[in-house]
């Protein structure tokens, strides 16, 4: 199986790894942080991150999700930072798309 490096483990990196896996390639995701999701983590996980307390997405939960893995139905229309972080972490654990994640510390 061929491997492809994906730089950063935010939403775009996760989407890239998923798309690569769907094409039969193994994605190796590299990020400088020790958590998945990029800026979409709560203040405890990423205290120096760009997201602030109370921040929400500017897109509804119907527009900022993978078409085959929607947000929980009980989530508010515009997810908070911790909700997006949980969604992205859940996505990575449930998809099991053959991705390796390495934090570059």
Task: Give the location of each predicted region.
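Rossmann-like flavin
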Residues: 19, 85-98
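Glycine-rich active-site loop/strand segments that organize a redox cofactor
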Residues: 25, 32-90
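A conserved short coil-to-beta-strand element within the FAD-binding core of flavoproteins
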Residues: 101-105
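N-terminal Rossmann-like FAD-binding beta1-loop-alpha1 element of flavoenzymes
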Residues: 2-29
């Amino acid at each position: 199986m061929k491997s492809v490096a994906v730089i950063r483990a935010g939403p775009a990196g996760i989407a890239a790894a998923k798309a690569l896996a769907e094409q039969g390639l193994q994605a190796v995701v590299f990020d400088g942080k020790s958590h998945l999701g990029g800026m979409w983590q709560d203040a405890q996980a990423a205290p120096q991150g760009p997201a602030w307390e109370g921040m929400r997405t500017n897109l509804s939960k119907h527009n900022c999700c993978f078409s085959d893995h929607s947000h929980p139905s009980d989530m508010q229309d515009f997810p908070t930072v911790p909700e997006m972080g949980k969604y992205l972490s859940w996505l990575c654990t449930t998809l099991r798309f053959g991705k390796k994640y390495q934090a570059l510390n």
